[in-house]
Amino acid sequence: MALTKVSTGVVDMSQDTGGLVIAKGNGTDVSSGGERPTCNATILGSIRENTTENKVEVCTAGGGTPAWQFLEEAGPSFVPLTVDYLIVAGGGGSGAAGAAGSGSGGGGAGGLLTSIGSTALSLNTSTSYSITVGEGGTPVTGVTTPRYTGGDNGSDSEFSGTGITTITAIGGGGGGSGSGSGSNCNNCLPNAGGSGGGTGFAGNGAAGTAGQGNDGGISASGAPYAASGGGGAGSAGSGAPNNSTGGNGGLGLSNSITGTATLYAGGGGGSPSYNGTGTGGSGGSNIGGDGTSGLVGNNGTVNTGSGGGAGSPTTSSNSTGGAGGSGVIILRFPISYSAPTISNISPAGGLTITNSTDGTHRVMTYTCATNTTVSATLTF
């Protein structure tokens, strides 16, 4: 007969030279069709062999919520699941102008939020969290009616789940077009966002979001107007210094969550008044799209949330804006934890995942496989 329960406080096995055989089974909970009992308050202290990972695990509430944790050979048995994050939204697209129009504003960078230098998240194992990685604002192609069109905003990036405050980085604002009002206008003014879009008409750029980005710049004061740069996470977009020079995009910010300092969220450059003459504004930190005196603006760098740069129309051809760069979510946590499982990716195939290490930490990077907003569920 098998021994199923011991009623004494101590079991003396000191004379036994063999081993204690414990329960074993795969690492999937019975509630999901596996063999592992759900860890809850009634079985705290239970141990078993996880045959999926070939490790011994214990049901514990050391992290605050009952969960299975692996036993380690050395060091502390339980390492808290403390997660640093970098969340960047998609950058805004630049504006565009019709033939014989003036310059257009650069797109604002996507909002940037990070725990580096601040407070990391405390997450729980066997718990699902949702992520959304935002696409960049689509470029405005050379439309003829109406003659002036502002750029599209980038899409938000977000991390959410039970027990934490949702973290939402706001998409970058679209750049304004080469006119400010009238029947020829379609969303001509720049848009607010994580960082604000630059303006292509007399006046100020759009506002950025406090704690995430900065404002777009100011356009040249007289007609025909050169346009300003979109705001970046590190600084506001620059104003157009004169009618033949577009304003530079705002600077991005450097972040070392991966172990390597990398720039994110630069603003897009504005375009000059006239095609073929003058100079477009530079994209912020060389990751925002450059403005140009040519017809087609340059795109913001993908996976950085940077704004698109603007182009300049000729007397007979419409300009085309640059697209904003897609956003990114990066998570950093102790290497003793495996990469979270991924599910519910929408659209299917839309998420690119990179699993790397930096010393004692694992670094997970999530980006759009194409410039399309993608969502998914992570389970640690």
Predicted features along the sequence, with ranges:
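The right-handed parallel beta-helix/beta-solenoid scaffold, focusing on the short coil/turn
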Residues: A2, G9-V11, G18, P66, ...
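Tryptophan-centered short beta-strand motifs
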Residues: L3, G63-E72
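Extracellular/surface-exposed low-complexity repeats and stalk/linker segments enriched in Gly/Pro
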Residues: T4-E53, E72
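Low-complexity, glycine/proline-biased repetitive segments and flexible coils/loops
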Residues: D29, G63-G64, T82-F380
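Short beta-strand segments and strand-loop junctions that repeat across beta-rich extracellular domains
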Residues: E53-P66
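Extracellular/luminal ectodomains of metazoan preproproteins built from arrays
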Residues: E72-G75, T341-S343
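Short "repeat-start/strand-capping" segments in structured domains, especially the N-termini
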Residues: E73-G75, P80-D84
